């Protein structure tokens, strides 16, 4: 019921843009490898607590935030990966990785930040929608283990749909692409 909202999602996002940029840069400067995202989880939990959003820890370092709407309804999950890669960051940034040999080369710091922004806004407008939104801050995406832990800990129980996202440089900024079924749902390891 977007007509019940006092501000559009874009207006709400613009209001918290500086806060989200700061959060993303903090995550970027302190990356952690799969299944070692302990400080990352602490930062996520601190932000969820600041925003008054209920959560629970699952797996080793995953967190599920839960936002319940006005009435019962469908349950939708948004998934953001939180782990970094074992790559040295050679960029000269004010918020460059402080963890030698580890960086957010795949944009998981941005994914986590976007999910956190969505969580904040959805929590503020929860009286305008029915159902439940779960935000999965998923550990160990790069090792293909994190989603299994969320499922094993019951995170998917009652979920009607899951939306994950990834930055993609051929899609214009401010736009998104979606389609039916799985998109980009494959993984493999190549040894050279």
Language model region names:
Residues 5-104, 109, 113-129:
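Acidic/His- and Gly-rich active-site-bordering loop/insert found
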